[in-house]
């Protein structure tokens, strides 16, 4: 009964005349004047099966009771379809199976939604509650297959380059890595907790101290953080670490790996080396540290042109150490009314902007609410700086650099999508390099690591650690694809004294550093090699390669935006007995 000879989608005209055995699900059933037609589906596709009393009355009798999503074992002969009945939209559309035997392996209830790609119009909550049905859809299977092919290409490449696939602990200690940890109470050690790893960062560095030299892992990671469309509480990363390698060596190897992934999953050849862009350039031109380079509309600094204008919004911003930047919406003058531009201003306000100034370029100069503040010379300079022409709309932001970059950068992306400027078929990879080592929080009066506390400063900047730490650059690099951060890496600190100075800079007392990272500091005393690595988000990579916009579509059993599983109803309550075993009590129950 289980001797399948073909997958449904693999039968071609070459098999005409063969007797075959197929397994699968009923996609559709049609009863037409004594004949019953069934579209049989498996993971490869669909084939039409015909039940004809002239071939087998017994098979026809069974087929009369079959419904959608029944699981069948079918025997029959491959026959060419009659002229006029060929389906050019189906891979198997030139043939059909004349059934001479059928076994119902399992019956099925009517599913809550049709098993087709049109089901994407159904509520996502319904699909997630019945995820095992959702995964039957061709688009979902293709995404799962793409994910498999990506990891297969990654494993193959790293294996060919001498890497060892080594697992690191899932139950580990809690360390401050940015997001909140998921904590696991210990039954044996009363009042103590494990943490699920936010990344294998410390373990992979310790593997370098161990002399492994080349490590990788398709690693599960966990972060208890606020969610959004491209984040999940549990996620998978391609985790890589190497000893005795420079930043350029690691970037070169990572992009060669991505070239193999693109070649084997999308049939595309990446042009190597990938473009490099400094962090400062990305922020200045794109208003983002993960620039989408598939379209122009770059941010242009016009501070020098407008710094002495009588328009106080501009002149005051520059005088107070801020900037004035602008973007040119090509051909946008006639497309946006004053009301439309006000709506763009409201959008920019979400990113801290206090307003959005604008002018439209006409044949005799610029027109708009602030045009009167620009004499002919300033108008000419603005038009030249922004490469503007008649019919263009110029949008201005004036504030501190961070606010202008964030608001105009977000506005650029919004307008790029709305105006159809983005070629969705493009895969624009690039590296963002020369990152600042630290970020300063003026409210708290302290520094935070821009990446993580284990990133090595640029060697030449080490002398600034005591005098001007805010000016230090990091040996760090992010890989960006189409405006998404695929992942990042860095050369790591491997000398105890530098690591201790970094901890101190981040506000750790010597006692706190020893308590939380003492094992790492001690390991560095036993001959730690220079090392570095990179971690790339597998879920996000698959999302982009599949042309999806939501990480949940790339994970077999994802969580919702509120970090719950609708299918298993996790998280859920546990019994008092379980809590007692773990020496826990619930402080206060809050009903949702």
Curated annotation (Swiss-Prot):
It is found in: Cytoplasm. L-aspartate binds at residues 177, 223, 451, 492. ATP binds at residues 223-225, 232, 485, 537-540. One of its GO terms (biological process) is aspartyl-tRNA aminoacylation. Residues 201-204 are annotated as: Aspartate. The keyword Ligase applies. It comes from the Bacteria. GO terms for cellular component: cytoplasm. It catalyses: tRNA(Asx) + L-aspartate + ATP = L-aspartyl-tRNA(Asx) + AMP + diphosphate. Pfam families: GAD, tRNA-synt_2, tRNA_anti-codon. InterPro entries: Aa-tRNA-synt_II, aa-tRNA-synth_II, aa-tRNA-synth_II/BPL/LPL, Asp-tRNA-ligase_1, Asp-tRNA-ligase_1_N, Asp/Asn-tRNA-synth_IIb, AspRS_core, GAD-like_sf. Keywords: Aminoacyl-tRNA synthetase, ATP-binding, Cytoplasm, Ligase, Nucleotide-binding, Protein biosynthesis. The record marks 84 as: Important for tRNA non-discrimination. Its EC number is 6.1.1.23. It is an enzyme of class 6 (ligase). GO terms for molecular function: aspartate-tRNA ligase activity; aspartate-tRNA(Asn) ligase activity; ATP binding; catalytic activity, acting on a protein; nucleic acid binding; transferase activity. Signal peptide: none annotated. HAMAP family: Asp_tRNA_synth_type1. Homodimer. Belongs to the class-II aminoacyl-tRNA synthetase family. Type 1 subfamily. Aspartyl-tRNA synthetase with relaxed tRNA specificity since it is able to aspartylate not only its cognate tRNA(Asp) but also tRNA(Asn). Reaction proceeds in two steps: L-aspartate is first activated by ATP to form Asp-AMP and then transferred to the acceptor end of tRNA(Asp/Asn). NCBIfam families: aspS_bact (TIGR00459), PRK00476.1 (NF001750). This is Aspartate--tRNA(Asp/Asn) ligase.
């Amino acid at each position: 009964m289980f001797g399948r000879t073909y997958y449904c989608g693999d039968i071609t005209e070459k098999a005409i005349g063969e007797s075959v055995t197929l397994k699968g699900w009923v996609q559709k059933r049609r009863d037409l004047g004594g004949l019953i037609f069934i579209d049989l589906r498996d993971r490869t596709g669909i084939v039409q099966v015909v039940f004809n009393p002239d071939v087998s009355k017994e098979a026809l009798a069974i087929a009369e009771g079959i419904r959608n999503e029944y699981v069948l074992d079918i025997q029959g002969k491959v026959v060419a379809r009659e002229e006029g009945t060929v389906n050019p939209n189906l891979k198997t559309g030139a043939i059909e199976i004349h059934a001479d035997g059928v076994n119902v392996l399992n019956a099925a209830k009517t599913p809550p939604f049709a098993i087709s790609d049109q089901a994407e119009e159904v509520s996502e909550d319904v699909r997630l509650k019945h995820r095992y049905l959702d995964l039957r859809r061709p688009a979902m299977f293709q995404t799962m297959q793409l994910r498999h092919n990506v990891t297969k290409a990654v494993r193959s490449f790293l294996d060919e380059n001498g890497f060892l696939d080594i697992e690191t602990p899932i139950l580990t200690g809690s360390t401050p890595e940015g997001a909140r940890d998921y904590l696991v109470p210990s039954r044996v050690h009363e009042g103590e907790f494990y943490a699920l790893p936010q990344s294998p960062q410390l373990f992979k560095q310790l593997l370098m101290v161990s002399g492994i030299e080349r490590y990788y892992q398709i690693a599960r990671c966990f972060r208890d953080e606020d969610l959004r469309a491209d984040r999940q509480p549990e996620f998978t990363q391609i985790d890589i670490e190497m000893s005795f390698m420079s930043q350029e060596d690691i970037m070169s190897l990572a992009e060669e790996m991505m070239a193999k992934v693109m070649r084997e999953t999308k049939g595309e050849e990446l042009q190597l080396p990938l473009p490099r862009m400094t962090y400062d350039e990305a922020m200045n031109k794109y208003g983002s540290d993960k620039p989408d380079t598939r379209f122009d509309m770059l941010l242009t600094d016009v501070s020098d042109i407008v710094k002495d204008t009588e328009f106080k919004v501009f002149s005051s911003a520059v005088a107070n150490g801020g900037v004035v930047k602008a973007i040119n919406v090509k051909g946008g003058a006639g497309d946006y009314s004053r009301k439309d531009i006000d709506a763009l201003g409201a959008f920019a306000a979400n990113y801290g902007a206090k307003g959005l100034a604008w002018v439209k370029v006409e044949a005799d100069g610029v027109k708009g609410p602030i045009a009167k503040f620009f004499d002919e010379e300033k108008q000419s300079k603005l038009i030249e700086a922004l490469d503007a022409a008649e019919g263009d709309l110029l949008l201005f932001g004036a504030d501190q650099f961070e606010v202008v970059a964030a608001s105009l950068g977000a506005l650029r992306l919004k307008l790029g999508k709305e105006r159809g400027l983005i070629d969705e078929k493009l895969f624009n990879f690039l590296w963002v390099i020369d990152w600042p080592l630290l970020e300063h929080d003026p409210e708290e009066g302290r520094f935070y690591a821009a990446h993580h506390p284990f990133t090595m400063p640029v060697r030449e900047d080490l002398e600034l650690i005591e005098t001007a730490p805010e000016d230090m650059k990091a040996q760090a690099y992010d890989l960006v694809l189409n405006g998404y951060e695929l992942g990042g890496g860095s050369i790591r600190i491997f000398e105890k004294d530098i690591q201790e100075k970094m901890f101190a800079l981040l506000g750790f007392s010597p006692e706190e550093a020893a308590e939380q990272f003492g094992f790492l500091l001690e390991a560095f005393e036993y001959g730690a090699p220079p090392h570095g690595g990179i971690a790339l988000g597998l879920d996000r990579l698959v999302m982009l390669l599949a042309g999806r916009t939501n990480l949940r579509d790339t994970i077999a059993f994802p969580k919702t935006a509120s970090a719950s599983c609708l299918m298993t109803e996790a998280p859920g309550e546990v019994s008092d007995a379980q809590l007692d075993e773990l020496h826990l009590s619930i402080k206060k129950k809050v009903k949702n």
